[in-house]
Amino acid sequence: MRPGEAESSGAVIAELMREALSNAGILDAVPAMLYGGFAGVGREEERRDLETELYRLEVADEIIVDSDAAIALADAFDGGAGIIVIAGTGSIAYGRGIDGSLARCGGWGTVFGDEGSGAWIGRRALGIVAAAADGRESATALTGAILTAAEVNTVEDLVPWAIAAETTEVAALAPVVIATAAAGDARANALLSLAAEELVVHVRALALRLFGDERASIPVAFSGGLLQKGSLLRKKLEQRTRSAVPGAQIKSVEIIPARGAVRSALRRIRLPSAP
């Protein structure tokens, strides 16, 4: 959710709720609780605005709006201590300490933050292509790959494309960078290594803030489209995490944020824990 868009976001969520209930054959009941994790509500004002709008729309008796990072953390550690790093279109790290305290790192948005994310990688890939065209950098296979992905013919054509592109379109260049790196391009590999370095800085910052020492035993999990198990960026990030955060205990299980929301909701209404 973008700032100031609580009303439109609430309408979309309400419609999705109606569709879900209808598909389940539930036509007249009001859910006891809506526990949702959404992008763009990591700060209190956005969270409160969306929650207020959903109450106005009467989508459930009790409504809890949380961040997408929070429900991913809940699935990764089921209420226990740990740090999760999420990298998709944007990026953020979120964690819970042994004492239950919560902290976030990053997630400042794609304009001046979200380091290591798809949008961040895409923007830098465009810069590399421009630099190679100028002769400021060596030739790279990224040039042809990016031109093909953007469906333009020349580097000059990338200027109007980039100006008009949505953030998700720029982020969609990240898989192109990953594929080019996997094919052996040195510049693409260097960009992915830098992305991994940016992400591991988030882990280390939270390790120090929540656990006091990066050498402490710290459960760490990864989630998001760019950090699927086996991906080149994840491999680089795992390697750097083990080096920079010696106490990191990396979880290899798949993170399902929606399951984290269910677990959190069940704890609130005191029902048996979700599987």
Predicted regions and their residues:
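Phosphate-binding/catalytic loop of phosphoryl-transfer enzymes
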Residues: V41-A139, P272
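ATP-binding/phosphotransfer module of carbohydrate and carboxylate kinases, centering on a glycine-rich
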Residues: M1-A32, Y55-R56, D75-A81, L126-P275
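FAD-binding subdomain of flavoenzyme oxidoreductases
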Residues: Y35
